């Protein structure tokens, strides 16, 4: 139960209070619950969409996007912004890229990337709501957080003594594979929609991981957050394109 609470506290803005400071082992095990947190967030978005039925589609999409950002505290958007600044400003140099990621200030590249990301999500939400295909509301956050579990399972963490290092070092690998297998099976049970979502998430994961390895030799907390946002966006936009035909 405690690892689940740790995952909820870290991945959401919900007021979760832990009984004590988590141990590295508990932090590592919390990764196993990341897909469950994604499923929970997706269920909340689906419920909100049901409650907003009858409202203007534009307003529905805007409110759902605002809720999505509020529930996550914009944590992963921050990672995306930092990664965007660092990737451009690092000029291919790993040390400079890592240094820029530590800078709390956001440059113009970060702002542009965030605007594009939010516009894409808003537009995709509008399409899936109008097409009455709410499965995308669940699949996007689920696969985004499953991607984090997969990332820490197979990718080195490059910042020594960071939180990510404790997560990766204490992740039960056999259980992680079982959790990922359950996610895959669950998506496949949804038929063509689930298969498309899995494919989009998988391709995005592989491309992003390849970029991380080439530039940094591994991942950081910021690039992990960027990966989550990219996977969510790819799944949401891809499913919107499917239903919009």
UniProtKB/Swiss-Prot annotation:
Keyword Lipid metabolism: no
Database matches in InterPro entries: CobS (IPR003805)
Cofactor: Mg(2+)
Entry keyword annotation includes Disulfide bond: no
Membrane topology: Multi-pass membrane protein
Keywords, ordered alphabetically: Cell inner membrane, Cell membrane, Cobalamin biosynthesis, Magnesium, Membrane, Transferase, Transmembrane, Transmembrane helix
Pathway(s) of this molecule: Cofactor biosynthesis; adenosylcobalamin biosynthesis; adenosylcobalamin from cob(II)yrinate a,c-diamide: step 7/7
Transmembrane regions: 31-51, 57-77, 109-129, 134-154, 176-196
EC number(s) stated in the UniProt entry for this protein: 2.7.8.26
Compartments, record wording: Cell inner membrane
GO biological process: cobalamin biosynthetic process
Gene Ontology MF annotations: adenosylcobinamide-GDP ribazoletransferase activity; cobalamin 5'-phosphate synthase activity
Catalytic activity entry: alpha-ribazole + adenosylcob(III)inamide-GDP = adenosylcob(III)alamin + GMP + H(+); alpha-ribazole 5'-phosphate + adenosylcob(III)inamide-GDP = adenosylcob(III)alamin 5'-phosphate + GMP + H(+)
Listed GO CC annotations: plasma membrane
Protein family (similarity comment): Belongs to the CobS family.
Name of the protein: Adenosylcobinamide-GDP ribazoletransferase
Protein's organism: Stutzerimonas stutzeri (strain A1501)
Gene, per the UniProt record: cobS
């Amino acid at each position: 139960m405690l690892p689940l609470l740790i995952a909820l506290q870290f991945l959401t803005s919900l007021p979760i209070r832990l009984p004590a400071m988590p141990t590295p082992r508990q932090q590592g095990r919390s990764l196993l619950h990341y897909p469950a947190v994604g499923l929970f967030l997706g269920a909340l978005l689906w419920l909100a969409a049901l409650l907003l039925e009858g409202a203007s589609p534009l307003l529905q999409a805007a409110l759902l996007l605002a809720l999505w950002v509020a529930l996550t505290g914009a944590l992963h958007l921050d990672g995306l912004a930092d990664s965007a600044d660092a990737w451009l400003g690092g000029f291919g140099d790993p040390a400079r890229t890592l240094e820029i990621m530590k800078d709390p200030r956001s440059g113009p590249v970060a702002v542009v990337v965030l605007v594009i990301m939010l516009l894409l999500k808003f537009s995709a939400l509008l399409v899936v709501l109008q097409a009455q295909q709410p499965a995308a509301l669940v699949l996007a956050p689920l696969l985004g957080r499953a991607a984090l579990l997969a990332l820490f399972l197979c990718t080195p963490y490059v910042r020594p003594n960071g939180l990510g290092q404790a997560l990766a070092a204490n992740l039960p690998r056999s259980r992680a594979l079982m959790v990922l297998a359950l996610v895959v099976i669950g998506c496949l049970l949804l038929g063509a929609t689930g298969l498309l979502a899995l494919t989009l998430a998988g391709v995005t994961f592989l491309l992003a991981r390849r970029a991380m390895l080439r530039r940094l030799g591994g991942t950081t907390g910021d690039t992990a957050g960027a990966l989550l946002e990219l996977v969510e966006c790819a799944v949401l936009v891809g499913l919107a394109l499917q239903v919009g035909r």
